[in-house]
Structure formats: C-alpha cells, structure tokens
C-alpha cells in the first residue's frame, strides 16, 4: 500500500532488469542492421553508442564484435559529459571522429525510454 510520502515513487526504473534486457536487444539490432546491409562486425571501425552506462556499452560492443572493444572502437564521453540522453551518441561521434578515415565504417546507436533504439551506419567519404 502506498502512503503519502511515496508519491514521488510512482514510477521507478528497474535498472538491473533494463540492463539485462537492453544489452542483447541493442546488440541484436546492430547485428541485424549490419546483416541487412551485407556487412559484418569486422567491417566496423567504430561504434558510437548511447552514453548512459559504460558497462552496458562495453557488453553491447563485445556482443557485436565478439571480443572486448578497444577505446578507439567504442569511445565514451561519460567522464566529460555524463548521461546526455539520446544526444550522447552524437556527442561521442563529434568528439571521436577525427581519426575516422575515408571509406571506414561505423555505427551510431541510441537507445532509451520505452526500450526504443535506433542505429545508423556511417561511411566516411573522401
């Protein structure tokens, strides 16, 4: 039974549950996106992921790549900007694109409220 002091707790995020469910969901989304475009994880030079949780991003990248990602393959801006919601992946892209060269492929992926997720495959032009 809810009491008056609990009014601010009508909506509670179940962080561990979200983590367990979002990691495979996003990894599968990226893998499907790559497959739909006849690409493999090995084709990716970089993954700019939603900047909410470093551990979550590390596991997503590991599932997609089949190994631990390097810091250049999956950069983070969490230490500098914290969680900026859906803007995080674009901020990471902006801050970590200078050594992304012509012809290289990457994926930008954001995910969040309501288990929404989206990705875009990018190829650096000449």
Region roles according to the model:
Residues 58-62, 69, 85, 118-121, ...:
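Short alpha-helical interface elements
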Residues 1, 15, 82, 88, ...:
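Glycine-centered flexibility sites
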Residues 56, 66, 71, 82-83, ...:
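Charge-rich, low-complexity amphipathic helices
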Residues 58, 62, 79, 87, ...:
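A generic structural signal for well-ordered alpha-helical surface patches
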Residues 23, 54, 83-90:
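Short alpha-helical patches at coil-to-helix transitions and adjacent helical residues
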Residues 1, 5-77:
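Hydrophobic pocket-lining "lid/loop/helix" segments that shape and contact the acyl-thioester
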Residues 73-88, 109:
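Cysteine-centered functional microenvironments
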Residues 26, 90-126:
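Conserved beta-strand-centric core segments of catalytic alpha/beta enzyme folds
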